Amino acid sequence: MSKVASAAGKAIDWASVASKLKLDAATASAIANFRSRHAQAVAKLGTLREQATTVDFATYRSVLANKEIVNRIESSMKSFKPVKIDLNSQLKAINAFEAKASEGAKKNVELVKAELQNLSATLKNIEQARPTEEITIEDMKQAVPEIEKIVETMVTKGKWVIPGYREKFGDLSIM
């Protein structure tokens, strides 16, 4: 991994990524699992790189009485060729995971875009709204025609309190 990619990976606050991007639980757990497997692989690679890879057969020949065994082992090591592993199945699994993660990311992008549009429209409405001091009763009647009927019904029944007002805002009466 390049130094830039490594530094970028360390700079990310992975704990808050899921909440900030509003990822679903499956995507967040998949990212966490991938990060833990990556950390294990990096640790294993570090330990393997620290190990010595050469064998001093001359030392073993001088120490051991049976030099034939040392010769066999040396010839076996020289003739050793690592097994080539077909990585296609693993690459397919990685590609499938990547496709699923990409699909999840695209869904999240669409959700965020929709939410941003909704919030932008709401903000625009708030910015363009008249102050409440400038709104008249006639404006209210035009905006919500049924309000006049509701108020008339409340007045004829002698109800002077809006239902739910006290529960929401408390009782402001002094007496």
Curated annotation (Swiss-Prot):
N-acetylserine, modified sites: 2
One Pfam family per UniProt: Mt_ATP-synt_D
Key words of the record: Acetylation, ATP synthesis, CF(0), Hydrogen ion transport, Ion transport, Membrane, Mitochondrion, Mitochondrion inner membrane, Transport
Disulfide bonds: none
A GO BP annotation: proton motive force-driven ATP synthesis
GO CC annotations on file: matrix side of mitochondrial inner membrane; mitochondrion; proton-transporting ATP synthase complex
Major subcellular site: mitochondrion
GO terms for MF: proton transmembrane transporter activity; structural molecule activity
Domain of life: Eukaryota
InterPro entries given in the database record: ATP_synth_F0_dsu_mt, ATP_synth_F0_dsu_sf_mt
Topology of the protein relative to the lipid bilayer: Peripheral membrane protein
Entry's localization field: Mitochondrion inner membrane
Biological function: Mitochondrial membrane ATP synthase (F(1)F(0) ATP synthase or Complex V) produces ATP from ADP in the presence of a proton gradient across the membrane which is generated by electron transport complexes of the respiratory chain. F-type ATPases consist of two structural domains, F(1) - containing the extramembraneous catalytic core, and F(0) - containing the membrane proton channel, linked together by a central stalk and a peripheral stalk. During catalysis, ATP synthesis in the catalytic domain of F(1) is coupled via a rotary mechanism of the central stalk subunits to proton translocation.
Family statement: Belongs to the ATPase d subunit family.
Name of the protein this chain belongs to: ATP synthase subunit d, mitochondrial
Species the sequence originates in: Schizosaccharomyces pombe (strain 972 / ATCC 24843)
Gene symbol of the encoding locus: atp7
